A protein has these predicted regions:
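Acidic, low-complexity intrinsically disordered segments
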Residues: 2-311, 318-322
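Radical SAM [4Fe-4S] cluster-binding motif and immediate context
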Residues: 59, 229-421, 426-428, 432-441
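Short acidic, glycine/proline-enriched helix-loop-strand junctions
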Residues: 146, 352-353, 397, 401-405, ...
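C-terminal accessory regions of radical SAM enzymes
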Residues: 2, 6, 20-35, 44-55, ...
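Structural recognition of alpha->loop->beta junctions
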Residues: 162-180, 370-381, 438-453
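Conserved beta-strand positions
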Residues: 25, 121, 150, 174, ...
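Short amphipathic alpha-helices and their capping/turn segments at secondary-structure boundaries
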Residues: 7-19, 66, 365-377, 440, ...
Length: 621
């Protein structure tokens, strides 16, 4: 089922000699088939011909686009790509009960009159595991003489599992692929090179690979050619990018004696002919957070593009693609004392909007840098708070962050006029109910605009993953992990407990104790709830939140409409919502708006607050 050694040598020799070589990159969907066909209650959805399916994020991939640029620089290659995250979002007809027909049809459509010599499957997330195995099998069925390889963050960490589970796979790349691909395709006899390579694993070398594998990085990133976005269907990535889940607000400037109001626009309105384009200005991250696996692919030592190279690439995005917004995906953008200022300055000079998807190290976010971001039209930041428990941060996550820094940065952002999305992780190995209660209590005192609460996901390649193996904590296979589905247990918490607390904290922090509601910024709060309803139109807590805001503005008729809608949805799915309502002590059996509002204000009053100071000290631009 795999290629013979002579055929591998033949494919590589043709490329080495400068003959035209066809390369096809395939990206599996970052969603399991079961979650796509039957999305759980708390998943966002897409609709195809009146049937709901699990929502699939369409983020432009940087791995295969960088590899394409590098291959085109050194070899005579024709590169094509099929991203099945885009394919699923562009479906016109509802799919059958498998991905197979979708995969086959999309590949055949992309390869009409063209046959790939090399097929590369790239996977980043655990949820892509089963889909990537399907693509390897289908690729061999369609193109039995192609050299089939696989790589990416997930495959680097799970290379043994891929070789065990896929007899169709010829070789696996370990870590970043630019230099390994160059060395392979330049080798005199490919099979001899592979037998001794520290960057590639085959079925024949797997037994001795563990002891000799090592990264083979391009150390001077300026040597890399520009990322080749041309192999992608760029407009297709406008369908459902991660950035559309964030509010991307603009902040109104007002008198210091007036309350600050924000106008939050759904970022989809910002998506023009192409979506915001991702960039990386560096690779690597020196920190050792136990839940992170990026070092498995990119290492811990920092490598940077020069600021001048970043400027050149940004200008190219503007000139060639009409780019107006970028998504910065560096794992550690804040590396270097002045470099972050210079890179942001380059984007500001070109009037490019920027969104920091992977968040920014909070210790480095002083007021000077935050003001620079605000003056550069950055109106929203993702903050990697991760937990409100000092023990969890220090001992379980090994994250260099103190709760005092969290409070200071969130307060500074609000005063400067930057909307904040706080990332929170629940269910780390060793985390207890007491830790979660401590986190809940602290986070209520932090006036972030929105909290994004995720199930702790043991990414293959992370220390957390290895710890879960050592503790025999896995209840489901690692590849079943999802930011809304727990696959491990802790000594104190079952997977169901972890999922319950994750969603409970979402409901509590974003709706019942919504920061903007408590600060009296009702229009801001309503826009946030409306964004939720645009993703899930039957979310009762979003209707409840709008009702709270309207009642607080004495718009009682409108408030009652939304309260009634919330109660209706609660009762329609009572078995699902009842545990959360009980924990939050919300009585819907005999719901009375006036009594509810009085009770809620009493709950708010119990939380330590600096709301007046926060409001009154907003900076005026």
């Amino acid at each position: 089922m795999r290629l013979s050694s002579p055929r591998i040598n033949e494919v590589v020799a043709r490329c080495r000699k400068g003959e035209e070589t066809n390369v096809l990159f395939l990206l599996p969907p970052n969603i399991e088939l079961s979650d796509f066909l039957s999305p759980p209650e708390n998943y966002s959805r897409i609709k195809i011909r009146d049937r709901e399916f699990g929502s699939v994020i369409t983020d432009i991939p940087l791995g295969v686009t960088s590899l394409s640029g590098y291959l085109k620089k050194h070899f005579s290659v024709d590169v094509r790509a099929v991203d099945f995250n885009v394919v699923l979002n562009c479906l016109i007809d509802a799919p059958a009960d498998s991905f197979e027909e979708i995969f086959s049809n999309a590949i055949l459509e992309k390869t009409v009159g063209w046959r790939p010599d090399i097929i590369g499957v790239s996977a980043m997330f655990s949820s892509a595991y089963e889909g990537s195995l399907d693509l390897l099998r289908i690729s061999r069925q369609l193109f039995n003489d192609a050299l089939i390889m696989a790589g990416g963050n997930l495959i680097t960490a799970m290379w043994k599992e891929y070789l065990d589970d896929s007899p169709y796979l010829d070789l696996v790349c370990y870590g970043e692929g630019e230099l390994p691909l160059y060395e392979l395709l330049s080798s005199e006899i490919a099979t001899d090179y592979l037998s001794n390579s520290t960057s590639w694993i085959t079925h024949d070398t797997a037994s001795k690979a563990k002891d000799r594998l090592k990264h083979n990085f391009v150390n001077d990133l300026d040597e890399l050619p520009p990322v080749d976005y041309d192999i992608l269907d760029l407009p297709g990535y406008s369908k459902n990018p991660t950035v559309s889940r964030f509010s991307v607000p603009t902040q109104s400037r007002m008198d210091s004696n007036e309350r600050v109001e924000a106008l939050i626009e759904n970022s989809e309105k910002l998506l023009e002919s192409i979506p915001p384009i991702p960039i990386m200005t560096s690779r690597g991250c020196p920190f050792k957070c136990t839940f992170c696996a990026s070092h498995a692919a990119h290492g811990r030592d920092m490598r940077y593009f020069s600021v001048q190279r970043v400027r050149t690439d940004l200008q190219r995005l503007v000139t060639k693609y009409g780019c107006s917004h970028v998504v910065v995906q560096d794992d550690h953008f804040m590396g270097g004392k002045r470099r972050p200022y210079e890179v942001v300055g380059a984007m500001k000079d070109l009037n490019i909007g920027m969104f920091f998807q992977n968040a920014l190290a909070m210790y480095a976010l002083d007021r000077e840098f935050l003001r620079l971001l605000k003056s550069s039209n950055v109106d929203e930041l993702v903050l990697p708070i991760e937990s409100g428990s000092m023990r969890v941060l220090r001992d379980l996550m090994r994250k260099p962050l103190k709760t005092s820094i969290i409070a200071r940065v969130v307060k500074d952002c609000r005063q400067i006029g930057i909307y904040t999305d706080a990332n929170i992780i629940v269910g780390m190995p060793g985390e207890t109910r007491q830790d979660i209660e401590e986190s809940r209590a602290f986070l209520k005192t932090v006036f972030a605009d929105w909290f994004r609460i995720y199930v702790a996901t043991p990414l293959p390649g992370s220390e957390m993953h290895q710890l879960a193996i050592d503790l025999d904590a896995y209840v489901l296979p690692p590849y079943r992990a999802h930011y809304k589905r727990a696959v491990i247990k802790t000594q104190d918490l079952s997977p169901d407990d972890i999922e319950f607390y994750t969603y409970l904290m979402n409901l509590e922090l974003n709706f019942v104790f919504n920061s903007n509601l408590r600060l009296g910024l009702y229009d801001v709060a309503i826009k946030g709830f409306e964004l939720v309803l645009s993703v899930k139109n039957d979310h009762p807590f979003a209707y409840l939140g709008i009702g709270i805001a309207q009642a607080s503005m004495s718009k009682f008729d409108q408030a009652n409409i939304h309260f009634d809608k919330a109660v209706e949805i609660f009762f329609a799915s009572y078995s699902y919502w009842a545990p959360f309502l009980d924990e939050l002590k919300i009585d819907i059996e005999n719901f009375n708006a006036e009594k509810f509002m009085s009770w809620l204000r009493g709950r708010w009053a119990l939380v330590p607050s600096e709301s007046e100071e926060i409001i009154e000290s907003v900076e005026v631009g």
